[in-house]
From Swiss-Prot:
Zn(2+) 2 binds at D67, H68, D211, H269. SUPFAM superfamilies: Metallo-hydrolase/oxidoreductase. Binds 2 Zn(2+) ions. This is Ribonuclease Z. The lineage of its organism: Bacteria, Bacillati, Bacillota, Bacilli, Bacillales. Keywords: Endonuclease, Hydrolase, Metal-binding, Nuclease, tRNA processing, Zinc.
Length: 306
């Protein structure tokens, strides 16, 4: 799987950073792509990448602030002409996202050539799609804002070649039956596939947060995540200022990483007042401290594979 950032700035775009947008490539589990937030200019950012809008079958919105949704109407209309014709799209977000899109499309007299299924979240969402489990929990941002916990499917355990050879089954196409089915037939005998495979392997857990100040639900979302994407609007100075505006300070994020036992964290949504050079300087300073957990301040077009 791979996460790509198309926008990493908070509130306003800068000359170096666009507003928020994240793509989650589901390979090898699926050929589809999920987007998380669509800030203004997202579709233009995507033009500089190999991702195709026709592969986007889900869009998740964390909250209704403009730097997270102003690019959505344009991206939806462009999807009609970039491989999305006739391909259903599921749009998940806070209450109001459906009215926002339908009103924008109606007033601009825009037509889509594919269906949209809207799922509006009140307080919590539990959603399943092709083996993926998605949980959304309310955060603390002054308006409804959500964090998403994505659990990838279990994958079949490794085939025990030695055990299969003991019954006379040599490596070949038949091994796919063992891998993909509960039972398989060989020489007129029905076998249980699980007797010839290792334990199923748990897929990665990804936590993607909307804007928030520290709150109890954060640890539920991030618990033992392999990868966490979290905002840090404030990456230096007095953290009380961040919390006054219902945002997170980098110290808040580090505390969450430790308490939730997160493997690695990708930090985005840094204030638009920071230049890339300033972010890099602060990053080096933080990483020089022995207590700093594994993290990265991401830039536009950064990708992380796992």
């Amino acid at each position: 799987m791979e996460i790509t950032f198309f926008g990493t700035s908070a509130g306003l775009p800068t000359k170096e950073r666009n507003t928020q947008a994240i793509a989650l490539n589901l390979e090898p589990y699926s050929n589809n792509i999920w987007l998380f937030d669509v800030g203004e200019g997202t579709q233009h950012q995507i033009l500089h990448h190999s991702i195709k809008l026709g592969k986007v079958d889900h869009i998740f919105i964390t909250h209704m602030h403009g730097d997270h949704i102003f690019g959505l109407p344009g991206l939806l209309t462009s999807r009609s002409f970039q491989g999305g014709e006739g391909k259903p799209l599921t749009l998940i977000g806070p209450k109001g996202i459906k009215a926002y899109i339908e009103t924008t499309l109606r007033l601009s007299e825009s037509k889509l050539n594919y269906p949209i299924t809207y799922i509006e979240i009140e307080n919590h969402l539990s959603y399943q799609n092709n083996g993926f489990n998605v949980e959304a929990h309310m955060l603390n941002h002054g308006i409804p804002s959500f964090g998403y916990r994505i659990e990838a499917p279990y994958t079949s355990g490794k085939i025990d070649v030695s055990a299969l050879k003991e019954i006379g089954l040599e490596p070949g196409p038949k091994y796919q039956d063992v891998k993909n089915n509960e039972t398989f037939e060989y020489n007129g005998i029905i076998y249980n596939s699980k007797d010839f495979k290792g334990d199923a392997v748990k897929g990665p857990v990804i936590a993607i947060f909307g804007d928030t100040m520290p709150c109890q639900n954060e640890e539920i979302i991030a618990d033992h995540a392999n990868v966490m994407v979290h905002e840090s609007t404030y990456i230096e100075g007095d953290k009380s200022l961040a919390n006054n505006y219902h945002h997170s300070h980098i110290e808040d994020v580090f505390t969450l990483i430790e308490n939730a036992h997160v493997d690695y964290s990708l930090i985005t949504h840094m204030s638009n007042r920071y230049t890339i050079e300033e972010v890099e300087t602060i990053s080096k300073s933080l990483k020089s401290l022995p207590t700093t957990p594994p993290f990265k301040f991401v830039k536009d077009f950064d990708s992380w594979s796992f």
